[in-house]
Regions:
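N-terminal secretory signal peptides that target proteins for export/translocation
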Residues: 1-9
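Electrostatic cytochrome c docking/interface patches
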Residues: 30-57, 153-163
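Short, solvent-exposed loop/helix junctions and linker helices
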Residues: 48-52, 56, 97-99, 130-133
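Periplasmic/extracellular electron-transfer cofactor-ligation site
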Residues: 49-50, 55-86, 110-120, 146-153
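Axial heme c-ligation environment in periplasmic c-type cytochrome domains
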Residues: 78, 88-89, 107-137, 154-162
Length: 163
């Protein structure tokens, strides 16, 4: 509680204390909010319910480019005339498993350019307006559930490094 008799003769000091106190609360409060909105990897390839949702979402939003069996497009490593690449496979023959869950989540949510170098051309759209976070995590759980055990273990090492 502020001593009002002190403030009557020292308005500028009281004002400064109030401003600094508010800024401190804002920084501390902002850190709490930031900590609450940072998402940890939530793609569980052993969760049948999450996998089922992920398969439905994948079929509706992803299979058109990445293939109904996660096979991707032919020649996915060869640049197209417009400078972008065909959609890669999400099975063990692709590079999806080389990335941590959070990285994959961000690419789906914010689009292919999110982690790409400047001027990189990507046909991967952002799904932040179309899919919920839970649906994106479910798609990742579905994809991971299709990988062989050894690939899942290698990809989990990426998650461990990023925690």
């Amino acid at each position: 509680m502020l001593n009002t008799s002190f403030c009557s003769g020292h308005h500028w000091i009281c004002s400064l204390l109030i401003v600094l106190g508010s800024m401190t609360l804002g920084l501390v409060g902002g850190g709490v909010v930031q900590a609450q909105t940072t998402t940890a990897p939530q793609a569980d390839p052993d969760n049948a319910e999450q996998i089922a949702l992920g398969q439905q979402v994948y079929t509706s939003f992803c299979a058109g480019c990445h293939g109904s069996n996660l096979e991707g497009q032919p020649n996915w490593q060869k640049k197209l005339p417009l400078g972008n690449f065909p959609a890669p496979p999400h099975d063990e023959t692709g590079h999806t498993w080389h990335h941590a869950d959070q990285w994959l989540f961000e690419v789906v949510k914010y689009g292919g350019k999110y982690h790409a170098p400047p001027r990189y051309r990507s046909a991967m759209p952002a799904y932040q307006e179309m899919l919920s976070d839970a649906e994106i995590w479910a798609v990742l759980a579905f994809i991971k559930s299709r990988w062989p055990t050894a690939i899942r273990a290698q990809q989990e090492q990426q998650n461990t490094r990023n925690r």
